[in-house]
Amino acid sequence: MNKRFNSEDKIILAIDGLDVSQAKLLLEKCPDIKWVKIGLELFVREGPRVIEILKGLNKKIFLDLKFHDIPNTMRAACFQVSKLGVDIISIHSSAGLKALKESKKASLEGAKSLGVKPPFVVGITVLTSFSLQDFQTDLDRNNSIEENVLRLAKLSFDAGLDGCVCSPWEVKMLRNIYKNNFELITPGIRLNIDSKDDQNRIMTPNEAIDNGASKLVIGRSISKAIDPNKALIEIFKSIESD
C-alpha cells in the first residue's frame, strides 16, 4: 500500500454542537487529529477562549463563521479575527468582489499588526445542505448549483482568496480549472454506513479526495461513532492508499 500524502493534513474535525469539555474529550480520544473546525454555535457560546484552548492543544483551527456583510464590516471583522491566530477563516463569496478583496487584505493587516501568521481566507460557494430542487426554488431558478459554484469560485480566485468551500460534487470540476493553486475544502462527507442528516450533496472521504479535495470537513461520522478514533483511523486508511 503506497501512502499518497500525510492524511492528518487532510481531515478537519468539526466540533460544532459540542461544548469545550466535550471537544477536549473527543480530541483526547483522537490524538491524531491535527485540524479542528469551530463553527458559529461553539464560537457564540464560548467566544475566543475556545480558540486559545484548542491552540493550547496544538491544533490548527478553521474558524468557520461565514462572514457575509457589506465590505467595510467584513473588512473590520476579518482584521479582528486574523489577530486570533487561527489558520483558516471563511467568508461568503456572494458578498461580492470588493468585499472579498477587502477581507483578504484585512486578514493580512490584522495578522501583521500582532506578528502572527495570516490565515487562509476561503470563500463559501453553495452550502452542502442545498439540493438542486431547494436551491432553484429558494435562490436561483434559472441556473444550476454547478453554474453558481463556478461563478462564486471564480470570484473568490479573482479576489485573491486562498481557496473556496464547495460540496464534493463540485470538487472535480473546480480542481480541473484551478489545478493545485487553490484550496478546495469539502464538507458533506459521510461514510457508507452514515445517514446523510441535513446534508444533500455528499460523498465518501476517498471519493472526495480522489476528485481533488484539499481538505475534508468531517463531524458526526467521527464524533458520533461508538469508537471515534477507530472511525478516524478507517478514514485515514481509506484516503491514504492509491
From Swiss-Prot:
Keyword annotations from UniProtKB, A to Z: Decarboxylase, Lyase, Pyrimidine biosynthesis
Annotated GO biological process: 'de novo' pyrimidine nucleobase biosynthetic process; 'de novo' UMP biosynthetic process
Binding site for substrate: 16, 37, 64-73, 128, 190, 199, 219-220
Superkingdom field: Bacteria
One Gene Ontology CC term in the entry: cytosol
GO molecular function: orotidine-5'-phosphate decarboxylase activity
Alphabetized NCBIfam families for the sequence: PRK00230.1, pyrF
Subunit structure: Homodimer.
Protein's recorded name: Orotidine 5'-phosphate decarboxylase
Organism: Prochlorococcus marinus (strain MIT 9301)
Upper lineage: Bacteria, Bacillati, Cyanobacteriota, Cyanophyceae, Synechococcales
